[in-house]
Curated annotation (Swiss-Prot):
A GO CC annotation given for this chain: plasma membrane
Catalytic activity: di-trans,octa-cis-undecaprenyl diphosphate + H2O = di-trans,octa-cis-undecaprenyl phosphate + phosphate + H(+)
GO molecular function: undecaprenyl-diphosphatase activity
Domain of life, per lineage: Bacteria
Source species: Chelativorans sp. (strain BNC1)
Membrane topology: Multi-pass membrane protein
Protein encoded by which gene: uppP
E.C. code: 3.6.1.27
Protein name: Undecaprenyl-diphosphatase
EC category: hydrolase
Length: 268
């Protein structure tokens, strides 16, 4: 395995971990990095399996709370209602993701210009919502009305357009619906668990034939890097957005989108 390839795997794993749970589009960053670095040979298999590192990261950080919810589920109505809310929010993306899988993966994911455009547009929207979102009505993620869970789930469907961001679409939707900034990020974590796990399982089912023993080393490096980076982000993001909001992420999206556009137009 070439040293340069290991270095690329490490970089892309860190990139996946750091960007998966913040509203900047991990897919957009990974695809643009792969496009400009020429990291195409293990593309799909690598991208699928490093996502597992990010999934396990959020599960490990919230393991105690998830275990408590599991114990309470049979006899605690509030816990059952919260789990129902997560399921309601998850279903729209699950249904559309399966129905439109081929279009999403073969058409939209092959368009760097679209990715850059969505990074920029999403950055502008995030800046606007961060500045002008209405006064928070909901601060406890377990107490949203069921209609709010559904609407956040519908917003999440926008993330199927590469460059939009899964966490970004859910956070923007939550803020527009009156959810507190911290709670918006926290609910995005919980919604990520079934959404990312489902996407990972379906992607793996569709592409398992691409996995080879030769890829294991590079995938292992990317997986570990993604896990460590994602743990750091999940542990720190809630306090960060409570103090600073989301403006920094909006400006970052615009910067990367413009940089990507220049690269696409100049380098192709």
């Amino acid at each position: 395995m070439a040293e340069q390839t290991i270095a690329q795997a490490l970089m892309l794993g860190v990139l996946e971990g750091f960007t998966e749970f913040i509203p900047v589009s991990s897919t957009g960053h990974i695809l643009l990095a792969g496009h400009f670095l020429g990291f195409q040979s293990t593309g799909k298999a690598f991208e699928i399996l490093i996502q597992l590192g990010a999934i396990l990261a959020v599960l490990s950080v919230y393991a105690g709370r998830l275990w408590k919810m599991l114990i309470e589920l049979p006899h605690e109505p509030a816990t059952r209602r919260f789990v129902l809310g997560i399921l309601i929010a998850f279903l729209p993306a699950a249904i559309i993701g399966v129905v439109a899988y081929q279009i999403i993966k073969t058409v939209l994911f092959e368009t760097p210009l679209l990715i850059c455009t969505m990074l920029i547009l999403g950055g502008i929207v995030l800046l606007w919502v961060d500045r002008w979102a209405k006064k928070p009505l909901y601060r406890d993620i377990t107490q949203f009305p069921l209609s709010v869970y559904l609407k956040i789930g519908l917003f999440q469907c926008l993330s199927m357009i590469p460059g939009t961001s899964r966490s970004g679409s859910t956070i923007v939707g939550a803020l527009l619906l009156g959810v507190d900034k911290r709670a918006a990020a926290e609910f995005s974590f919980f919604l990520a668990m079934p959404t990312m796990a489902g996407a990972f399982a379906y992607d793996l089912y569709k592409n398992y034939h691409l996995l080879t023993a030769a890829d294991l080393q590079i995938i292992g490096v990317g997986f570990i890097a993604a896990f460590v980076a994602a743990v750091l982000v999940v542990r720190s993001l809630l306090d960060f957005v409570s103090r600073r909001g989301y403006a920094l992420f909006g400006w970052w999206r615009i910067f990367i989108g413009v940089l990507g556009l220049i690269g696409v137009l100049v380098l192709g």
